[in-house]
Amino acid sequence: MATAVGRLVLRRPGAGGGARWRFIATSPAAELSPTELTEMRNDLFNREKSRQLSLTPRTEKIEVKHVGKTDPGTVFVMNKNISTPYSCAMHLSEWYCSKSILALVDGQPWDMYKPLTKSCEIKFLTFKDPDPKEVNKAYWRSCAMMLGCVIERAFKDDYVVSLVRAPEVPVIAGAFCYDVTLDKRLDEWMPTKENLRSFTKDAHALIYRDLPFETLDVDARVALEIFQHNKYKVDFIEEKASQNPERIVKLHRIGDFIDVSEGPLIPRTSVCFQYEVSAVHNLNPSQPNLIRRFQGLSLPTHLRAQFTIWDKLVERSRKMVTEDEVRQTENTESTQ
């Protein structure tokens, strides 16, 4: 499938791995195609995941106490560093499995598929809770990561796409976003309605695949190796690593797309229902490296909107998310 953009063509990359190679840490990005970079990153991710699992060859039991409004006091005997909040939900009911978006583990927001590391208390969070703030933030964050995946894959291997960051923005801003730099040959390109529809279609393909959001905490050294070809991610990793003495960085993966994200994120892509890539804005047209802000809107399957309301929300989401809104969120996070 190809989409024309002026004299350029945007083509969805085909499935498949491509040739194998030897990893050379000093190789410039130009030597690896986007498909090869994806392979390399996943190889390193899988290797680190296997290494971490091998550190606990003997199964150790932990006790997890449920403190929710329903079924309070239920205690699960689970496997340390293997069992997840979703594993606990499976012992309760199908309702918990299908409705839970996040867990609170000893009061801390936690991914549903992130392994539990010690005996703890657990509570499950849903979109219908009296205060869904943490759930909404996780949903927005996850939708932005999906947007990054779509944009990175939408351009054929001939064009370099560098993901910069997914700014934390409040839901009330009306759109989530991902900042991106494109190949210099695309500096004059602005997306048509057909391009936006193509991006949206790719996002719905991710939703249809019902992919889990995997999470992996790694040493900054591992994260830097995975993202060695993206200077923006390298800077972001260094920033995050400097914020904790262990220099631990959180990675997430959907399918074969890996990103740096503090999380927590939603359990699966199928939590999303309505999703649209609605706008692209130029952030710094006077600077040498043009940064584009791709924006989108989504509602989960639990909170669907009628078409007329959805259309109004989409129209609102086209307005550029400003740096003031981004800074407002960052300042709020830093004071909590």
Swiss-Prot record:
TM stretches of this protein: none
Domain of life: Eukaryota
Keyword tRNA processing: no
Keywords, comma-separated and alphabetical: Acetylation, Mitochondrion, Ribonucleoprotein, Ribosomal protein
Record CDD domains: TGS
Predominant subcellular localization, coarse grouping: mitochondrion
Domain TGS: 60-126
Subcellular location: Mitochondrion
Gene3D superfamilies reported in the protein's UniProt record: 3.10.20.30, Threonyl-trna Synthetase, Chain A, domain 2 (3.30.980.10)
N6-acetyllysine found at: K123
Gene Ontology cellular-component terms listed: mitochondrial inner membrane; mitochondrial large ribosomal subunit; mitochondrion
InterPro entries documented for this protein: Beta-grasp_dom_sf, Pro-tRNA_synthetase, TGS, TGS-like, Thr/Ala-tRNA-synth_IIc_edit
BP GO annotations: mitochondrial genome maintenance; mitochondrial translation; translation
Any one Gene Ontology molecular-function term assigned to this protein's record: structural constituent of ribosome
Subunit structure: Component of the mitochondrial ribosome large subunit (39S) which comprises a 16S rRNA and about 50 distinct proteins.
UniProt record similarity statement: Belongs to the mitochondrion-specific ribosomal protein mL39 family.
This protein's name: Large ribosomal subunit protein mL39
Taxonomic source organism: Mus musculus
Organismal lineage: Eukaryota, Metazoa, Chordata, Craniata, Vertebrata
Gene: Mrpl39
